[in-house]
């Protein structure tokens, strides 16, 4: 005979775990932390694959990113409830209180930031303040600047692009404990310019504009009902939005060559990145020509596959 009390408890625990996965936006957080881990591995002083350090970086990254997302959902409880896409989130639906979300965010964010500093300390510099402070800054920028700004002005997309790209720099700095792009790293008798983290940051920074505007185009109805101002023009999807998507896609081409130029990776990855960038330009131009949701959706899905292809190509072809 089934013990109904035990079944109820198991269901309750499973539901709570599911709520926390939704609270931290697990899929989004995983994507963000993925870029952080790959950029850590791209640092010249990281040789081989240390599962322990990768696991620690993954956990720390998920805690910091999850903290930012939890605050975002607590702040946007009412607006999330207005949108079909987000109405079932734990705070918006009432399954979790704002206080619980904030408490989780405070604990997760603090632990994640401390992990970044402690576990990635170096014998020369000790506690990795660069990685810890960058993580804290990224969390603050996303949760307390970008989140409220979304209802005020579309410049929020520009502001949000910084915490969106900082994981690349954080991963690099976790490995090098150096933020200065003009500093040098000595690895096996060879000097490397510490510009790599900033190059990777630039790639992910520019990528976010066609990516996010495509999402905002597709979900414009939902965003409008919630009062979010995320497109370059207040009137909604316009030719100007498409031009912006094309412009940033084109800018991604020269920036995509920089890893090869600075000796971070080889020619094979350079051509793969170039091909991926040209593909993004083509999709953005199609959006400019057709000005419809179908084309915006193509840009959106193209951007989803762009980042893992580019990052993994650079890692596989690491110099």
Would you name each region that the model predicts?
Residues 85-131, 236-260:
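Multi-pass membrane catalytic core of lipid/isoprenoid biosynthesis enzymes
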Residues 34-42, 46-77, 85, 109-113, ...:
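Membrane-embedded alpha-helical segments that form the functional core of polytopic membrane enzymes
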Residues 2-13, 75-96, 213-241:
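Cytosolic, membrane-interface loops and tails of multi-pass inner-membrane proteins
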Residues 237-240, 281-309:
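Interfacial loop-to-transmembrane junctions
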Residues 48, 161-216, 220-221, 225, ...:
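Functional transmembrane core segments of multi-pass inner-membrane proteins
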Residues 63-71, 140-148, 201-220, 253, ...:
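Transmembrane alpha-helical segments that form the membrane-embedded catalytic/substrate-channel core
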Residues 98-178:
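Intramembrane alpha-helical segments
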Residues 169-181, 252-259, 306-319:
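Hydrophobic alpha-helical transmembrane segments in multi-pass integral membrane proteins
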């Amino acid at each position: 005979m089934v013990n109904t009390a035990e079944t109820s408890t198991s269901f309750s625990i499973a539901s709570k775990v599911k709520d926390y996965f939704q609270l931290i936006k697990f899929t989004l957080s995983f994507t963000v932390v993925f870029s952080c881990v790959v950029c850590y591995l791209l640092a010249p002083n990281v040789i081989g694959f240390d599962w322990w350090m990768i696991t620690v970086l993954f956990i720390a990254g998920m805690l910091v990113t999850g903290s930012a997302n939890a605050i975002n959902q607590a702040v946007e409880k009412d607006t999330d409830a207005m949108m079909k896409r987000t109405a079932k989130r734990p705070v918006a639906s009432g399954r979790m209180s704002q206080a619980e979300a904030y408490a989780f965010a405070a604990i997760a964010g603090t632990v994640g930031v401390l992990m970044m500093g402690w576990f990635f300390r170096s014998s020369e510099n000790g506690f990795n303040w660069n990685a810890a402070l960058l993580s804290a800054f990224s969390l603050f920028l996303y949760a307390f600047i970008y989140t409220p700004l979304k209802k005020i002005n579309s410049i929020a997309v520009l502001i949000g692009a910084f915490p969106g790209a900082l994981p690349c720099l954080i991963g690099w700095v976790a490995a090098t404990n150096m933020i200065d792009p003009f500093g040098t790293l000595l690895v096996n008798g060879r000097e490397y310019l510490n510009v790599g983290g900033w190059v990777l940051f630039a790639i992910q920074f520019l990528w976010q504009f066609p990516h996010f505007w495509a999402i905002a185009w597709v979900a414009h109805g939902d965003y409008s009902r919630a009062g979010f101002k995320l497109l370059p023009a207040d009137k909604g999807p316009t030719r100007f939005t498409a031009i912006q998507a094309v412009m940033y896609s084109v800018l991604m081409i020269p920036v995509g060559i920089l890893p090869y130029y600075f000796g971070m990776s080889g020619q094979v990855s350079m051509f793969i990145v170039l091909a991926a960038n040209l593909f993004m330009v083509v999709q953005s131009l199609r959006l400019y020509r057709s000005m419809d949701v179908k084309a915006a959706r193509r840009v959106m899905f193209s951007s989803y596959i762009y980042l893992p292809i580019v990052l993994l190509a650079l890692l596989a072809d690491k110099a």
